[in-house]
Regions:
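Acidic (Asp/Glu)-rich catalytic clusters
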Residues: 21-32, 77-86, 152-161, 205-207
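Carbohydrate-binding surface patches
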Residues: 306-388, 424, 429-436
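N-terminal substrate-binding region of glycoside hydrolase catalytic domains
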Residues: 1-76, 83, 93, 99, ...
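Noncatalytic carbohydrate-binding groove/subsite architecture in carbohydrate-active enzymes
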Residues: 109-252, 270
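Active-site-proximal loop/turn and secondary-structure-junction residues that shape catalytic pockets
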Residues: 39-41, 96-100, 136-140, 171, ...
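The substrate-binding groove and active-site-proximal loops of carbohydrate-active enzymes
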Residues: 2-16, 53-68, 96-113, 135-142, ...
Length: 441
């Protein structure tokens, strides 16, 4: 974001131009910033180690006091521009995956702990009410070493504020350090909740049981070329984990919003397996629509089970979401990707047939408008439409416009005036359907 430079005599120059453009836009969209304080401005860095195509510097600061001054000025600027009430609703996360030494942090574990403490105290010195935390830890450390335990012990013993704990999780097995397997193992779907529960136990043991837990990176794969990211599989994947972690975490942040992404070079295909909810051309993937359908749920939970959830809103309207999650098969889970190709991406899943649900409602009073939103390989999956188009590598304007129109759930409506109503839902593998019953006046 080019926030820091220096004059010839070493006097700091702070520049918030790009920060303001970004935060102004986010706030205009109703989005609350979750601020990650990384990576290191090059003129503050102790060394020249970098990561990713855009060369983010992973070094600790050469002078901690200069970094702290930058942080204080940044916080003051945010408070002055947006007001204390607004900024108090944000979160400030210190660094990204410092447990991955030599990858995202070019210092020692002890250096990160001290860096975290100094950074948090710099923030709190300006406005104590601001929410600070971290360490945005990778999930491998959760299973393979005591990094999280030692971090929390340090915070407790040194009386360093930890307002929230953050970590990242993906499906790949976090290999032990002594293992040198080439193949990557995919864990079962229960692995996400098991990881959360394991971390919660560690937090309780360290006397941080009441601290908010945030997953600030989450997706199916940590690999930004995993071809499954574009497929219909991702819609029930998102819904399954949103439901399975309900109440266990404060926030679940999908990584990432778009395939316009500068950690690696840009592939030629419009569907190359990028992390994003939206591809580089602005086409919305099934994962995007999964979040959109979740957003339509009400605030009162009525029922939840294997493949379904029902909610209600204050006016008596109801919402029922059904999903058919199918996991990858044992061969793919073991690391064999030989059945996966750019145009053939569904032979790597367990063989499951359609799944049937039945929704029966009684004692309905008044009139309801029932709207169904169907999303599956034949209805609204833009990747599958691209395959049926012939999988062109470079999309013309006409082709792109066509795919935009074919992306998204198929919608049907009907009016319900009877006191009893029954609906059968038949979902193919990876299929999703939302039924909303809106009270009519």
């Amino acid at each position: 974001m080019m926030v820091y430079s220096e004059k010839e005599d070493g006097t700091p120059i702070y520049n918030w131009s790009y920060v303001d453009k970004l935060y102004d836009f986010l706030l205009e969209q109703g989005v609350k910033p979750f601020v990650e304080l990384s990576f290191m401005p090059s003129q503050l860095a102790r060394s020249k180690e970098t990561i990713f195509w855009w060369r983010g510097n992973i070094s600790p600061p050469a002078d901690q006091t200069k970094w702290d001054a930058l942080v204080r000025e940044f916080v003051r600027h945010c408070l002055n521009r947006y007001g204390a009430k607004e900024v108090e609703s944000w979160y400030f996360e210190v660094w990204n995956e410092p447990d991955l030494s030599g990858v995202c942090w070019a210092g020692s574990k002890e250096e990160y702990f001290a860096f975290y403490a100094s950074t948090v105290r710099a923030i709190k010195s300006v406005w104590p009410q601001l929410r600070t935390g971290g360490p945005a830890m990778g999930y491998g450390s959760l299973w393979n070493d005591p990094w999280a335990d030692e971090f929390m012990d340090y915070c407790r013993e040194q009386e360093v504020p930890l307002d929230f704990f953050s970590f990242h999780i993906y499906s790949e097995y976090p290999r032990l350090k002594e293992e040198r397997e080439h193949l990557t193992k995919i864990m079962p779907p229960s692995f996400y909740r098991e990881s959360i529960d394991r971390l919660r136990e560690k937090m309780k043991a360290a006397a941080y049981g009441d601290v908010e837990l945030h997953i600030t990176e989450w997706n199916f794969s940590m690999y930004d070329r995993n071809l499954l990211h574009d497929t219909m599989f991702m819609a029930p994947f998102v819904i399954y984990h949103a439901m399975n972690t309900l109440g266990a975490v404060k926030a679940l942040a999908f990584w990432s919003f778009t395939d316009v992404f500068e950690e690696s070079t840009v592939p030629t295909s419009p569907f190359y397996g990028g992390f994003g909810l939206i591809n580089r051309d602005g086409l919305k993937k099934p994962s995007y629509y999964a979040l959109e359908l979740l957003q339509k749920l009400g605030d009162e939970l009525l029922v939840q089970g294997d493949g379904y959830v029902g909610t209600r809103t204050r006016d008596g309207s109801m919402q029922f979401l059904f999903y058919h999650y199918v996991h990858v098969d044992p061969l793919f889970s073991s690391g064999d990707w030989s059945e996966l190709s750019s145009t053939n991406r569904y032979d790597v899943f367990e063989e499951k047939g359609n799944r049937n649900f039945e929704l029966s409602l009684s004692r309905l009073t008044g009139t309801f408008k029932c709207t169904s939103y169907r999303l599956d390989r034949q209805h609204g999956s833009v990747f599958d439409e691209w395959i049926r188009m012939g999988a062109p590598e470079f999309l013309s304007e006409e082709e792109l416009a066509y795919l935009h129109k074919r992306s998204g759930p198929v919608i049907r409506t009907e009016l319900l005036r009877q006191d009893r109503w029954r609906k059968e839902i038949d979902l193919p593998p990876h299929g999703v359907m939302l039924l909303t019953l809106d009270r009519q006046y």
